[in-house]
Amino acid sequence: MKVLLIGSGGREHAMAWKFAQSPKITELLIAPGNAGTAEVGTNVDIGVDDHADIVEFAKNEKIGLVVVAPDQPIVDGLCDLLRQSGITTFGPSAAAARIEGSKIWSDDLMTKYA
C-alpha cells in the first residue's frame, strides 16, 4: 500500500520510521517531510496547508492511506476534505479536533460539564 504522511516535525519522523518497517507499505511519501523522513521515505514538496494540492497528489499517485499528523491541518479540515474526495484517511474530523484547536471552546465545554 502507498502511504502519504502529512507533516514535517519530529512526530512525523517517528511515524515515518515506524511505517517504513512495515512490509505492508510499498511506498512511503511524506509531505513536506524533513531530513529525517528523507532517510526512510520520499519527501514531497507540498506544504501541510496546501489542501487542494494534497488531495490532487493523493488521487494522482493512487495513495492507499493518508495520515495527517499535525494539529493545524486537522483543525482546518484536511481530513474532512480527503474523506469527501474518497481518499482513505487517518485523522479526526475538524469538528472532533475543535477541542484541541480552540482553547476557549474547550474551556467552555469543560466548564459546562464540570
Language model: regions and residue ranges:
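Rossmann-like NAD(P)H-binding beta-loop-alpha module
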Residues: 85, 109-114
